[in-house]
């Protein structure tokens, strides 16, 4: 069997994070005026701005909360170093912004405007505007990101088969409304580049490591959907972790370089059978399903070689099992083995039940409403949330892990240092400034430390900052 190379570090324990932007709206009834997303967002962030004089803060769990361009609330999770930990903090982000929405409803009611505030964890609004779910993976500085990105492109353009959230794509010209696998496939136009909005790439190459730039880079993946189902999220991130480990190790991964890969991503989204034909650079062709099958087989072999660090190999074996079952379901078109785990399968099944009653037309407005409601993050109101509460979908983590992540930073990474710093600053009402790598006590005289290693969760320099704060209470 193939043996990993010793030529470069393989990050079995890898720093990761997810950035989630939320769509926002509010109900309007009984002659109420329609509130713009900007107005709703201002009400949503009013308590944050009142407390911190900013709409861009680090929360108690060391995640970043801010108002992004287009009036989208966004949470960037704190640094995580294992799969289940990352899912817990991503779900904690949902809970945090939901709390803000509930508070915004109370504020509006106090002002005589009783209405519901909705936050949607999706990627496209009714006007066709797109907002993202961005994945971040630490890689070594020695890695040429464009080369790594090129090697990953066949995986990335076909990954929607296993982890797309699905959506009804409205009619376009002569093309009727239809169900597609991914909400982001129509929104990316390049493979690997430094752009983010004008011509969104699959992988962004801007050099912002949020750490020691001599040692680390950050791979920023823009193409992914915002998942509601925890197992789908685990498959999206877990399969990507395995791909990165194999490529870093020089493990034998099939050469599946696709000719003009970005040209095929939209065709793949239209085909839930995975039979979309992909021409190969070396001649011949393959299919989207075959690409995923070959990479899944390689990942299963890799499990026998990987170092036991970060995400446990037993958990990644669960990822590979779900990966295999999903590909088998696509191959046979019998989805009964994954219809409680894979987002697009769950959503399509729900929509098909209603579509049959409504005459089979994907353009029916009732279906668009169901599609959107799937992504409402309010417990007991959002459609996916109701399925989860009724035990009709599978979980990857439990509620206790999410609850613990709402107010406590990850304890295994640099986020722990930031969380402790923020906790003491809140306790002492100290004026501080924080970003991903720096912590600064502003008064009486500025004192700053930079923490450039995201893997380190203990550092005596933090004690110096905390002692300085405590010796100048109220400064």
Curated annotation (Swiss-Prot):
The keyword Ligase applies. Pfam families: Pup_ligase. ATP binds at residues 64, 77, 436. GO terms for molecular function: ATP binding; ligase activity, forming carbon-nitrogen bonds; magnesium ion binding; ubiquitin-like protein transferase activity. It is an enzyme of class 6 (ligase). Pathway: Protein degradation; proteasomal Pup-dependent pathway; Protein modification; protein pupylation. The keyword Magnesium applies. The active site is at 68 (proton acceptor). GO terms for biological process: modification-dependent protein catabolic process; proteasomal protein catabolic process; protein pupylation. Its EC number is 6.3.1.19. HAMAP family: Pup_ligase (MF_02111). Belongs to the Pup ligase/Pup deamidase family. Pup-conjugating enzyme subfamily. The reaction mechanism probably proceeds via the activation of Pup by phosphorylation of its C-terminal glutamate, which is then subject to nucleophilic attack by the substrate lysine, resulting in an isopeptide bond and the release of phosphate as a good leaving group. PANTHER family: PUP DEAMIDASE/DEPUPYLASE, PUP--PROTEIN LIGASE. Catalyzes the covalent attachment of the prokaryotic ubiquitin-like protein modifier Pup to the proteasomal substrate proteins, thereby targeting them for proteasomal degradation. This tagging system is termed pupylation. The ligation reaction involves the side-chain carboxylate of the C-terminal glutamate of Pup and the side-chain amino group of a substrate lysine. NCBIfam families: pupylate_PafA. This is Pup--protein ligase. The lineage of its organism: Bacteria, Bacillati, Actinomycetota, Actinomycetes, Mycobacteriales.
